[in-house]
Each structure stands twice: as C-alpha cells, then as structure tokens.
Amino acid sequence: MTNVWNGMVIFSTTIIWTLLLVSIALVTFGYIYYLKWAKTPLPQLDDQHALFVTIMVPAHNEGIVIVKTVQALLNFNYPHDRYEIIVINDNSDDNSAELLANLQKENPTRSFKVINTDSVTGGKGKSNALNIGFKSAIGDVIAIYDADNTPEPNALRYLVAELEQNDEYGAVIGKFRTRNKDVNLLTRFI
C-alpha cells in the first residue's frame, strides 16, 4: 500500500512541477513577445489616399458597453475623413437607441450612422444586422467590431496597413479585449 502512495505522491509532484514550469515558460515567452511587439513601429499610411473604411457594429441590448465602444472608434488614429461608423441597433429594448442618438449629437461632423431596426426587420441575429449595415456601407474595406470590444487607437491603422501590404489577403483580424467578460456566465466563455 505504501508503494501505491509513494507512486501517487511522485506522480502528483511531477505533474505539479511540470505545470508550474510550463506556466513560467508561457509567461516568459509572452513577455518577450510583448517587448518585441511594443517596439514595432506604427505602420506608415498615406493619410491623403488611405483606404476608405466602413466600420460596422451590430448591437442588441448593449447599452452598458456601446458608448465606450463608439468613443474608441471615433478616437482611431486614422484620418477621420477616411472612415465611417455604422452601428446597427438590432431591435434593442434597452437604452441603446438613446445613447447612440446622444453620441451622434455630440459628434455632428463625423460620419457616424445609426440604423435602428424594428421587430420586422431586426432581431434576427448578428448576420442579419450586418446584412442591413452592408446596404449602407460605402467603404473599400469593411471592419466589424462587436459592441463590447474596445479597439486600441492604432488598431484600424494596423489592419489597413496589413491589407495594403499583402495583395493576396482578403481579410485580416486583430486582437481585442472584451470589457464585459465577467458580467454573466455567457460572457465568461468569450
């Protein structure tokens, strides 16, 4: 019986140390990658001739997070006359419509459009909301952000630069951070 216990202790100790070493390696290499990435220069774009981008944000009952998302989009380090923002308020029954209307009033000189759907045209999911937004889009490039994402100021510049530098690319994706990840069980799985 003591041989079994000794074997279990050795096995458990080995597993714990292995997991600890793997965790240390991941943190170390992650930090090294971060330091390397932080030194990457900002992509150079010809601001006069930058691609025109349509940014679409489908939103359903996202009043808690939509204001910060739109403000982050309005603050992009990208020529303001070279992108438009379309928020598709997909049949929300919270205060999303009011909040978005206030943002439009606060930013009258920006290309910022809100499409409010009703129970007939909306409420059929993200893909339907995006299809509604596509009808109004005029950009050479389409960027899609979820309503609970907060893109960093240079995010659009990096994405467009990547597309411009690689003719064979049809799409690119950037990293994101979700602000409401701890709100409920569903958002914890994101």
Q: What function would you assign to each model-found segment?
A:
Residues 80, 89-99, 119-121, 150:
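A conserved acidic beta->alpha catalytic loop
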Residues 104, 108-109, 116-135, 153-190:
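Long helical/loop segments within the catalytic core of UDP-sugar-dependent glycosyltransferases
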